């Protein structure tokens, strides 16, 4: 129990650039150049967890990430045709992995949703947003 309490208290401080790189690269967004971990935050409550971080990328890595998103087979330039509530899907527990790639006014976005495979367990929902105006990548992990 003490370990759990300590982990919860120090989780943000123990998060490294390598942890960030692994989470981003899980979605096939490769980071080749040096980058900075600008911000890292997590919050949790009973049954809910939210983790976000922001990376300052090189222009080259930013452009490669945008190209990866825009060249996806399911890329949508008009975000009105995307499922805005992907993480609240009625297929939270069972079903197939879904990835959405789309453009908003401010960012290029890749979302990943994987049902948990077990009734009552939160699915995996992760979002990567690449800024249109800055060399920034924002990662979000939402478990509800």
Where are these regions (language model features)?
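N-terminal export/targeting and maturation segments
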Residues: 2-77
